[in-house]
Amino acid sequence: HGWITLEATLAGFFLGTALGILLALGIVHNKAMDLSVMPWVIASQTVPILAIAPMIIVVMNSVGITGLLPKAIISMYLSFFPVVVGMVKGLRSPDQMQIDQMRTWSASSNQLLWKLRFPSSVPYLFASLKVGIAASLVGAIVGELPSGAIAGLGARMLAGTYYGQTIMIWSALFTAAF
């Protein structure tokens, strides 16, 4: 059951990381995107995932998409936010003096990104990835609950709840924790 949840966790984590990095690059390089997209990114995290997950599962099932993808999308939804916030903070972390120095050397915006901004953002990225993988695991487990899955840690927790098997619930929780 752990492998089923791990697949959805990793798929959602990689999708969320890619989306988060791309959004962060756009937000840092485009003022209009900063003013328009960043508030929506922050607002997206105000709605509890337990309210959104059943809707995502139902909508995707209605168009014939079942299995790994709905769980991965729920995991992605939870894991992209820390990556966006961390990367925006990291890409904006170089001092103005460093940016001015690069411009003095006639650095292009791509050189500024690859030689200054991106290396400065790596510590922020890894801190964000640490938070993002945990959020992705939570998303995968939550995605298994309303889907009627028969395999996975969320399905084991749900089955334990149905049949009053507290050992099954706790074993799934401990497996998810480690």
Locate each region found by the language model.
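Transmembrane alpha-helices
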Residues: 73-77, 110-143, 175
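Periplasmic/extracellular loop-to-transmembrane helix junction in inner-membrane transport proteins
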Residues: 1-14
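Membrane-helix interface segments
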Residues: 29-37, 65-69, 109, 165
